Amino acid sequence: MSGKVIGKTLPLGYRGNVARTPDLIIGAFNNVGSANIPYGAPVIYDATNKGVRAVATTDSTASQLVGIAVRHIGQPKSDSPSGWYYAPGETVDVLLRGTICIETKAQTGIAARGQVYVDATDGEFTSVSTSNMAMPNTIFATGEYDANKISEVTILSRSI
């Protein structure tokens, strides 16, 4: 929910921030993939390696999507100017149910209770259904987004 002060609209939050906290479930999984998982990114459950990984271009099954990587407070990684991610082998906090702030690459068509999609080519969230995977049980909470392309989405029920 965005705040307003003297005609100014405040940001909704930051990528990966949990919002509206009373009803949420967060699970901890190892990053078993070879890629970094940015805060606020969708994650795939890897049953073979018993952990989560970032979305890859070869992914096409939405049922593999289990949640969104939660932002945590700490020092950024020194190898990247935007070093806010979980590296391979680290424990990833994953929102399994609840509301979280995400960055959307396409804001066209965002509507309250509208379906959230994931683009497998870059692992980013979008509101566009064409050639994208529907994130299971996940909707845009308010249909709003701020100047930083941040939207609130709600995962209605856990899938793992």
Predicted regions and their residues:
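Surface-exposed, low-hydrophobicity beta-strand/loop segments enriched in small/polar/acidic residues
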Residues: 1-160
